[in-house]
Amino acid sequence: MKSLKAKFRKSDTNEWNKNDDRLLQAVENGDAEKVASLLGKKGASATKHDSEGKTAFHLAAAKGHVECLRVMITHGVDVTAQDTTGHSALHLAAKNSHHECIRKLLQSKCPAESVDSSGKTALHYAAAQGCLQAVQILCEHKSPINLKDLDGNIPLLLAVQNGHSEICHFLLDHGADVNSRNKSGRTALMLACEIGSSNAVEALIKKGADLNLVDSLGYNALHYSKLSENAGIQSLLLSKISQDADLKTPTKPKQHDQVSKISSERSGTPKKRKAPPPPISPTQLSDVSSPRSITSTPLSGKESVFFAEPPFKAEISSIRENKDRLSDSTTGADSLLDISSEADQQDLLSLLQAKVASLTLHNKELQDKLQAKSPKEAEADLSFDSYHSTQTDLGPSLGKPGETSPPDSKSSPSVLIHSLGKSTTDNDVRIQQLQEILQDLQKRLESSEAERKQLQVELQSRRAELVCLNNTEISENSSDLSQKLKETQSKYEEAMKEVLSVQKQMKLGLVSPESMDNYSHFHELRVTEEEINVLKQDLQNALEESERNKEKVRELEEKLVEREKGTVIKPPVEEYEEMKSSYCSVIENMNKEKAFLFEKYQEAQEEIMKLKDTLKSQMTQEASDEAEDMKEAMNRMIDELNKQVSELSQLYKEAQAELEDYRKRKSLEDVTAEYIHKAEHEKLMQLTNVSRAKAEDALSEMKSQYSKVLNELTQLKQLVDAQKENSVSITEHLQVITTLRTAAKEMEEKISNLKEHLASKEVEVAKLEKQLLEEKAAMTDAMVPRSSYEKLQSSLESEVSVLASKLKESVKEKEKVHSEVVQIRSEVSQVKREKENIQTLLKSKEQEVNELLQKFQQAQEELAEMKRYAESSSKLEEDKDKKINEMSKEVTKLKEALNSLSQLSYSTSSSKRQSQQLEALQQQVKQLQNQLAECKKQHQEVISVYRMHLLYAVQGQMDEDVQKVLKQILTMCKNQSQKK
């Protein structure tokens, strides 16, 4: 029977058996042959789950054993099988970056778009791990690139989040959505800016990522780039914003064209002279970006001829046009500076500084050229505003260069036009570059303004949260802070106004480009009113002197006009020297004023630094004051709660008194409602007796009337009988009968009415009797309410006692609350004391830390000395080793000598002396060997001791005795070295 049962027993294939364990072990070891043999056995399955939820198929994919996977696939394993976590073999291969396994699975028709429990595909895991080959294979097999997981992430977002820029490039090239967002509203650009991956940011911007998108918190990509503190990413974003703004609002070039037209009309130069701007070379770009690279180039022979003769006015006018354009562009930059926020103005002003410095250097070069040829025209370039006035005067003369040129001019008109073309083209190129830079700055300023607005919104929301607090002191603090903010804003505005005035002076030529670097950061400073007034006075003085310089320049220009008209008069040498000395004095005065202003500025900076330090100290004091204010607020809250408790207890007492009064009133009202007064009862009894007597009289009357009616009936019957006896006619008889019938009917009706009346009266009498009985019962019960009254009184007294006990309990609770408040106050005082103790402990701990640091430094120094000593000891050991080697060599020599002596002794039978000498030498050799062994032992012991001490010193566990010994050793070593 057992054999039959065994034959017909069905083997359960889902149960875990030994073959499955062996299969897992073979996959773990990567033994493909063993895997193939085990899969051929019954009961073994590659997709069977163990107790931990693992399968052999998934383990092979996770470990990257391609041969094992191939064997399993040939045995017909389910490729789409998932483990307990919802991962397929493809997911695990991608998660562990095994691209060969991914290729094998995809070739065996494993779906690339399969999703696990978190909504991720294999491409999600490959992108997150940064395996480019796996991503390429999955994309070749058309894995969905823009499929989102449960968190809203596409593979591009995961690649950017983990900083894999190569995969980001690849996915973007294969159609990944650049502006895709996750559930928190973040795009790939925001994530790249947050982690600071400049390569990913660059790739995303090239593929058209939208910089204006905002996440669920209201932050854009520029905000996250500031969090990462990567200047390269910030510059990339700002340049992209500026380019987008250029495409949207192409108004700036038109304004520039209008300015150029106006300047050309003022100068009066013919349109043919303006050559088209050449393409921007790298050298020019470097000239614009780095002001230090600009150097003054020497003039050629043709240019010297050109500047030596009167027609050089055309080039002066072109230079003035360029400078006018530059002044307009700088005014645009100044207006932008007012709009930008404090945080971004520093970066933008630093960029502007570089550009302004490069321009000023270029202008200096031109001025040097002019000064080399004509000092009068060089002085004419000192003020920027004077160019506009001179252009109108020089217009007609520039329009007729042939008439004004003297016959002794060496340069031809073609040379003049060529030199003018070169200068104008260079200047136009630089102006265009500056305009582009200014447009970039405008974009950056707009983006910074948007961020400033966001910050203001956050500030307002935080203020609203602060306002929600109950403490009035917090609101007072916030109002104080807002007042301080307003004051700082007003100071900031005043400082900005002064910056603008300084920049205007830059245009007038009063401020040097070197001082511009100092003034660029002036907007950060909060200057007091007295300093501002002093600076304003200095500026006014400088402006007055600039006006004087303008007048001098105008006089020079008038002289130039006279020279153009034909009166070519060469000034004498004395006048030229006087003019030169006057201009030198003016320049020296201006330099002195600049130095004075710079000193003032430095003093203001120092004072502002002091103010900042005081502000910081005030902020720390305010923080401590806020803690004290919070404590005071808590004390006030406790006092208010005590007051509320006392008020509630008073209200409770009043309510109890009212309750007692109400109960007394209610008891009286209930008694009066339930019982009738005796006088009222007697009146009611009298009324009922009277009504009863009346009813009895009415009854007697009704009975008498009834008897009368009966008598009349009897009489009538007798009459009828008599009439019957006496014969009467039928008609009369009928009449009599009808009359009698009617009379009988009437009488019957009267009788029925009387009966009804009697019944009603009897009912009334019964009611009155009932009332009498009830009144009698009430009268009998009138003696009972005293007991009930006593019961009520006792119950009320018990309630009063209960209420009194409750009152006592409430009073006790109040006392407990009061005691708790006292305890809380004492605890607060204890906390204060503990806080003070903790602060003292902190100070002491800090001192201990400082002492420990000093000790640690000393220990380090001692360690260094120990190391030196160890090095010296090693050197000594080396010397000892050398000596030992020498001794061993001597010993060998002695042994050889002994051997030779022994041979001689054998041969010549040496004397006893030689044998004694040999023995002595052997003893010396033994002694030396013993000394060597002892030295080695001592050396090893010293090394072990030093090692132990060094370890203890590193761990900070060196004993004081050891330190003293080490110090003594070091002093001994020093003394020995000094003696040597």
Swiss-Prot record:
It comes from Homo sapiens (Human). It comes from the Eukaryota. It is found in: Cytoplasm, Cytoskeleton; Cytoplasm, Cytoskeleton, Stress fiber; Cytoplasm, Cell cortex; Cell junction. Its main location: cytoplasm. The modification Phosphoserine is found at residues 11, 281, 286, 293, 300, 304, 318, 327, 329, 340-341, 350, 358, 419, 512, 515, 667, 915. Keywords: Acetylation, ANK repeat, Cell junction, Coiled coil, Cytoplasm, Cytoskeleton, Differentiation, Nucleus, Phosphoprotein, Repeat, Spermatogenesis. Residues 349-374, 425-947 form a coiled coil. Residues 282-299 have a biased composition (Polar residues). It holds the Pfam family Ank_2. One of its GO terms (cellular component) is anchoring junction. Interacts with PALLD. Associates with actin. However, does not bind F-actin directly. The modification Phosphothreonine is found at T249, T295, T297. Highly expressed in placenta, muscle, kidney and testis. Moderately expressed in heart, brain, lung, liver and intestine. Isoform 2 is widely expressed and expressed in fetal and adult testes, and spermatozoa. InterPro entries: Ankyrin_rpt (IPR002110), Ankyrin_rpt-contain_sf (IPR036770), RAI14/UACA (IPR042420). Signal peptide: none annotated. PROSITE patterns: ANK_REP_REGION, ANK_REPEAT. One of its GO terms (biological process) is cell differentiation. The gene is RAI14. The modification N-acetylmethionine is found at M1. This is Ankycorbin.
